[in-house]
Regions:
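GHKL-family ATPase ATP-binding module
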Residues: 1-281
Length: 282
């Protein structure tokens, strides 16, 4: 039923917080900027407009929009000197978390590139930012390590006896944003900052691993750059860890009270629980 002749559509919601519940309502404007920017990232082509009243009747307006969603966001993060060009992949899968659970559909979208200057991984589900990741993060870790390790082994990039790469070696040069939508969602807890869907994790792992393997075959130059940078990250991390352990060992030896101090010997007593120490000035 038509009740008016306005051309614009939509819903306007105005609300005031209950001060008995929300005792502190001084929310910084940066919080709203962050929320709107994230929503613009995962809702491609939708403009989010923030109007902030800085004085009576005076407003500052900001707009947030990414025409191509997470793909444009990746390009913004990577800049002009990334190791590889950003890529965007998407797929749909159907499945269930357990045999006794209902089947549901999930839509997967991933945009990524590699860089030796910027590193960031963000995960979204049903337009919500997953601060603690959960299933998408686990899938990314598994798929990335599996696909890149396979490329390194197949192309003899490891030196003899060298340990396998780990996800931190990849993460140090990875810019990745994933956005998924599903008709069934299991959250880790009430804060809803991580999802635990087993099927989403399995579907995304298989999807991302297969796309990466194809990408490495079709983009040899990019694959070589990725492999080289991941190995640099790995070997740098291992060198730093060895240095840290050696330094810790040296410092521990200097302060180890169990070591005998020069010109001091254990006192002699039949009671093994007693010791005597003389502290002499100088």
């Amino acid at each position: 039923e038509q009740t008016g002749n306005k051309k614009r559509t939509g819903t306007t919601i105005r609300w005031l917080p209950d001060l008995d519940v929300f005792t502190d309502i001084d929310i910084p404007v940066d919080y709203y900027r962050d929320v709107m920017r994230r929503q613009a990232v995962v809702n491609a082509g939708v403009t989010f407009r923030l109007k902030n009243e800085t004085a009576a009747g005076k407003f500052e307006t900001e707009e947030f929009v990414y025409e191509h969603g997470i793909e444009d966001y990746i390009r913004e993060l990577a800049g002009l000197d990334a190791l590889t060009e950003p890529v965007y992949w998407e797929a749909e899968r159907r499945g269930r978390d357990r045999p006794d659970k209902p089947e549901y559909k999930v839509k997967l979208s991933v945009a990524l590139c590699f860089s030796n200057k910027t590193a960031l991984c963000e995960y979204y589900h049903n337009s919500s930012f997953l601060e603690h990741g959960g299933s998408p993060e686990k899938a990314t870790r598994s798929a990335m390590v599996s696909a890149i390790d396979k490329y390194l082994r197949d192309n003899n990039k490891y030196v003899k006896g060298e340990a396998k790469i780990t996800f931190p070696d990849v993460q140090d040069c990875l810019i990745l944003v994933s956005s998924s939508f599903s008709t069934q969602t299991s959250y880790e807890n009430q804060t809803k900052k991580a999802i635990t869907n087993k099927f989403i994790q399995e579907a995304m792992t298989e999807f991302l691993r297969s796309r990466l393997e194809i990408y490495f075959i079709e983009n040899r130059d990019a694959a070589e750059k990725i492999a080289a940078q991941v190995l640099i990250n790995k070997r740098s991390r291992e060198t730093a860890e060895r240095t840290r352990i050696n330094q810790k060992k040296k410092l521990t030896e200097k302060i180890d009270i169990a070591n005998r101090v020069q010109k001091f010997v254990d006192c002699r007593t039949k009671d093994v629980e007693r010791r005597e120490i003389y502290i002499v000035e100088g």
